[in-house]
Amino acid sequence: MYKKIFLSLVLLILSITGVSAQINTDRVMNIGRNALYFEDYILSIQYFNQVIKVKPYLADPYFYRAVAKLSLEDYKGAEEDCDKCIERNPFIIGAYQVRGIARQNLGN
């Protein structure tokens, strides 16, 4: 009897909270930006990769990942991410700046 009540409560709670396998991309983006702020560039790239995997059409994760790659001196990767960011949203001015810095360091 108690087992049935317990299972019913668990199912009710799960249905109310909306448990799903999808990630909350806004939250993951915030965590990635915080990692970037605290100069944990590798961790921030991992978080931005998660967002890109789920929503590849967004421009922001490409931009922030480019900033992290630039900080790690991965200039080619930063340039490629800026290109993808600009392709998705040409109004992110910082992407042009980061791409320019990356190209300057590449000698282009």
Residue ranges and their predicted role:
Residues 2-8, 12, 18-108:
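Alpha-helical tetratricopeptide repeat
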